[in-house]
Amino acid sequence: MSLLFFFAATVDAHGPVRQKAEEEITINAPAEKVWVIIKNYDDMSWLPAIKSTTADKGNDKGSIRVLTLKDGGTITEELKKYDDKKMSYAYKITDISTLKTITHSGAEEKVPVFPVDNYAASIDLEAKGDTTVVSWKAGYYRAYMNNNPPEEMNEEAANSAVTAILKSGLANLKTLAEK
């Protein structure tokens, strides 16, 4: 009987699970035209949620960029890989500012403006004649790394936030590139 209780308790008590999101869009424009819009690591003007971007080393690996959000707050990212010929780059989030503080399970918890942890992503373009397929992939954990997360930092909050960013970014990129 005690073995059964132990098994049931361990199944219920688990931490966060790595999440994955991928969005893809076909743009009716040549890859070179699309790449010109997104290739500069220090320019995220194509992403609707971003007010401004600064980066310390441009498109060089290790470049740190700070995204200032239109709704307030910042996200700091590091460029991990950049390939101009393949029209792709990869980055990871290194810091996220706090949106608010809540009390959860008797403790004060800082809710980040983007409810994820250990977030890494890549953007890849593939030329298909006069069209371009843009793929944006992300891997991440929910923001709350312990068991019993608050609503603001659970898997659903993380998945919703990531999906919204990827979809809105790609939709706006399509609009800009097809002008």
Give, region by region, the residue ranges found by the protein language model.
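Glycine-rich portal/gate segments that line the openings of hydrophobic small-molecule binding cavities
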Residues: S45, T53-N118, V133, L176-K179
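Bacterial N-terminal signal peptides
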Residues: M1-F6
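Hydrophobic ligand-binding cavity/cleft-lining segments
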Residues: A9-D60
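Structured segments of extracytoplasmic/periplasmic soluble domains
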Residues: I37-L47, Y82-K85, K128, G169-N172, ...
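Beta-strand/loop substructures that line and gate deep hydrophobic ligand-binding cavities in soluble
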Residues: T98-A164
